[in-house]
């Protein structure tokens, strides 16, 4: 019987060989995360609803948002769970980048979980005090930057590149590299969090950007593609396509429940962690500026808040009716679904522009 089993397995050698292909495992990671999200989603939402404390609604926000009171939050826990399970199942667990990105996701997710918990228990829309939130984010962001710098095994891994000007390469010293890594990880963590103010607004751009970063990761880890496209070759970076694919699958699964009108909100546990992951992957594959392009919706949302605060402090006047800017359009009379879909369209265009930089030289 064992001989027959051995012969049968030998016939399946070509099938098992498929698992050596990153693209194949990436597809499986996405599908696994997607189906896990769809399967576990209803149970997770019911569990979150038992807290009897949905996302607190801003009293100065659009009147239409008061109908959202009581909607369960912390739905990002579903994303983190399904992404982690999918990556552990399909990822190469010998790859240091896989463990780093998972660690960043979990650490920033823990900050978001505590922030959400305060909002629910204390009914405080502000959640965790900003200084403590930024302190924890800074600790984890700096730790990730230091890890990447001291484990870099090729000069390209600590060199700053400018898209479309691929002959320009700026070697980074320790401090400058860590500072850039810190700002991108912490910055995009907060940028995604600011964007997460309407049903499905943040998760779809996150899915799109994750897919594009997966393409960059795959190309950066492949000698042939990296040379042909004139992008930095980062050994081991290709494995990040598994994480990016898992995020895309989990994000689509979450969107099934988060689309307007939302059955559950992502909460800070999802927004902070996903933004940090996008920033970390961009730093690893040396595509920081491309992330600024592809994640333009997140950047615009963040800039709108900065402009609003600066204008009010300097002149006492507001530039926008309300910040982040998606609320400005709501107060102008745009229905929420219109704001959401138009921001999605902008994200699609920006992601395509970012992908085009692969060929533009």
Swiss-Prot record:
The reaction(s) catalysed by this protein are: UDP-N-acetyl-alpha-D-muramoyl-L-alanyl-gamma-D-glutamyl-meso-2,6-diaminopimeloyl-D-alanyl-D-alanine + di-trans,octa-cis-undecaprenyl phosphate = di-trans,octa-cis-undecaprenyl diphospho-N-acetyl-alpha-D-muramoyl-L-alanyl-D-glutamyl-meso-2,6-diaminopimeloyl-D-alanyl-D-alanine + UMP
UniProt-annotated location(s): Cell inner membrane
Q: In which pathway does it act?
A: Cell wall biogenesis; peptidoglycan biosynthesis
Query: What range does the record give for the signal peptide?
Result: none
Which Pfam families has this protein been placed in?
A: Glycos_transf_4
Required cofactor(s): Mg(2+)
| EC number(s) from the headed UniProt entry | 2.7.8.13
One of the entry's Gene Ontology molecular-function terms is: metal ion binding
Taxonomically, which superkingdom? Bacteria
Please provide, in alphabetical order, the Gene Ontology terms of the cellular component aspect for this entry: plasma membrane
Q: What is its main location?
A: membrane
Membrane topology for this entry? Multi-pass membrane protein
Which GO BP terms sit in this record?
cell division; cell wall macromolecule biosynthetic process; cell wall organization; peptidoglycan biosynthetic process; regulation of cell shape
Q: Where are the membrane-spanning stretches?
A: 25-45, 73-93, 98-118, 139-159, 168-188, 200-220, 237-257, 264-284, 289-309, 339-359
The record's function comment reads:
Catalyzes the initial step of the lipid cycle reactions in the biosynthesis of the cell wall peptidoglycan: transfers peptidoglycan precursor phospho-MurNAc-pentapeptide from UDP-MurNAc-pentapeptide onto the lipid carrier undecaprenyl phosphate, yielding undecaprenyl-pyrophosphoryl-MurNAc-pentapeptide, known as lipid I.
Concerning PANTHER family, the annotation shows: PHOSPHO-N-ACETYLMURAMOYL-PENTAPEPTIDE-TRANSFERASE, PHOSPHO-N-ACETYLMURAMOYL-PENTAPEPTIDE-TRANSFERASE HOMOLOG
Q: Which family does it belong to?
A: Belongs to the glycosyltransferase 4 family. MraY subfamily.
Q: What is this protein called?
A: Phospho-N-acetylmuramoyl-pentapeptide-transferase
The gene it comes from is mraY
